[in-house]
């Protein structure tokens, strides 16, 4: 395996194995390189993306057609952070914990956690980063109600929107920027890891909400909220014990599993169910009549109001 720089360490990484976890359009694999359509742009019909799999520049990627300079080039952690829908720091932790046997991250070791502890104060974002005009126009086009956008504090950031992530006490401890033009996103530097947070959970605690849906992405959560069902998001498809502890401690009684309508989404639902079973009542969305819909946002508010819910344990049809 090639030697790849991950954070401030060099480790042997099976780059091809990591990349084969994802679908690539117009992919051409060689021993040394992957050439494919850009994962950052759905409009890339002529492959403009490459990543070196071997050699001195193993793990380095480039995208000659990138709209955003942030994604013109970079290293494996940046690419995986995008593909896994997580922060750069979480991607680094993932790679080091998998490939560097000497690596130990104290932030990830959760010995008897106190679920409602706040994130470290050093992660609290300065107010000037997010005290900006609310952006309802972009998300209105995605079917999200303006009152939901305002409640979640989504703000205009020029060519992108800013999505604040708050800890259990409502402090903004991370900010995700999502491009208005394409699928790219990035995070404000110095923020907390999303693996330590649950998007929207502070409102669940503040308002004493007892019934929630769990989704992968923030926009899916806001879409669900626009139907009148509150939702929290994990920021990807990788649910962990710390996030489970936070949800259990929040006092919710009923959880709707609403991962994406694909294999990873079903695996996400299964993992959430495994960690929460016995603590809350579990329901799951029945996508059987909606095979063409990828996720909650694509299903839309009207579709969400019609989709059946099944009891996870006995598969009994539930009516809202």
What are these regions (language model features)?
Residues 1-13, 60-62, 70-73, 185, ...:
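TOPRIM fold recognition
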Residues 18-83, 155, 167, 284-286:
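N-terminal single-stranded DNA-binding subdomain of primase/primase-helicase replication proteins
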Residues 38, 63, 80, 139, ...:
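Terminal peptide-recognition signature
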Residues 88-92, 149:
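Small-residue helix-packing motif on alpha-helices
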Residues 91-131:
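Conserved active-site segments centered on acidic
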Residues 131-141:
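Short, non-transmembrane alpha-helical segments in secretory-pathway proteins
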Residues 141-158:
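Short, basic/aromatic recognition patches
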Residues 157-251:
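Phosphate-handling DNA/RNA-contact segment within nucleic-acid enzymes
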